[in-house]
Amino acid sequence: MRSQCLCALIWSFLSVVPEPQSGIDTLPGTRPLVMQGDIASQLVEGVDRFLLSELARSVDRRAVHWKRDTSSPAVYNNSVEPNRARLRHILGVRDSRVPFEAPELVNTTQRPALVARGAHYDVFAVRWPVLGNIHGEGLLLVPTKAKPGAHVIAIPDADQTPEQICGLTPGVPEESQFARRLADNGCRVLVPTLIDRHLEKRNNRAALTSRELLYRSAFELGRHLIGYELHKVLAAVDWFSKEGGEDARIGVFGYGEGGMLALYSAAIDTRIDVCGVSGFFGSRQNLWNEPIDRNVFGLLDQFGDAELATLVSPRPLVIENRSFPKVSLPSQGGAPAELAAPIDALKE
C-alpha cells in the first residue's frame, strides 16, 4: 500500500513539472561564461589577488575594533579587555586549566630528576598538568644561593630543546643560551618543550611537520596548537602567581616560535610583568608565507604585532630582532613555508 501511494505522489509531481524548452541556453538573468585558457589557473590567480588585497586592507580596518582610553593604566586595561578576550577566543585559550600545587619531578631508576648543576642553580626535569591529559614538560632551573629575584618562563624556538638554551647540549651559541643566563642572574626559570618542526610522511601519505599535523588535528576540535602551548605557559604563570602571591615578579622570554608564544601570553594575561620577544616581532602581512601552524583564523582583522604590543602596554616589552630562525619547508603534500629575518626577506 505504501509503495502504491508513493508512486502516485511521484506521478502527480511529474505531471505538473513543465518540460524543458529547447533552444534556451541560459537561465533568466544570466549569461554564458566565456573564458580563454586554463580556467582553474585563472580562478586560483583571482583568489590570490583578492586575498592579497584583503591582507593589505586589513591594516587600515583594525582601528574600528579598538576603543583605547589612556587616561590611566587601569582604565586602559579595561578599555582593551574586549580585544584581549577576542584574542583569547581565536587562539583557542578557552578552557579551564587543571590546578596543581607544583610541577612534579621526572625521574626513573636510571635517571634522577636533578639533571645538572650550575654555579648558582640546579636543573630539574619536570612536568605539570595543563588540560585533561595534556601536560607540559621541560626543565626547571632553581637558584641555590638566594631566593629567586624573578620567575621567568623561557621559551625556545620549535627547533630548539630546553637543554640547548640551558647550555646542557650543543646547538645554541653561549650568548644565546638565555635560560642559563637568566638563572645565572638569580631567576627561577621554567623552560617548556615545544612541538618541533620535524618533517616526515604521516600515515605513508603527505609529509607534514609535527606542528602542521597537530595544527590540522586541533582545527577539527575548534582549537589551535598555539592555544595548547599557550595553556602550558599560562599554567606555569598560575603556579608562579600562587607561590609568589601579589609580589611575584613574572616574566616571559622567547625566541622564534617561543617569541611568538611570549608575545601572545603577555598580551592575554596581565599577571605577566615583563615580556621579551626575540626573533619574531614584525609585519604579519606575509603570514601566508610562514608555517601554516602560525595561521590563526581572523587574526589580522584586529591584530598585527603592533596591536599585540599595545595589549602588553603599559607593562615593559623588550624586542630583540638581531637574529631570526631560518626555516625552509618544501611542499611534499603539506604547506610550504619560508622563515627568515625581515631584512633578508627584503633583500630577496
Residue ranges of predicted features:
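Bacterial N-terminal signal peptides
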Residues: 4-15
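Boundary at the C-terminal end of the N-terminal hydrophobic targeting segment
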Residues: 18-22
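Preferential activation on post-signal-peptide N-terminal prodomains/segments
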Residues: 23-63, 67-68
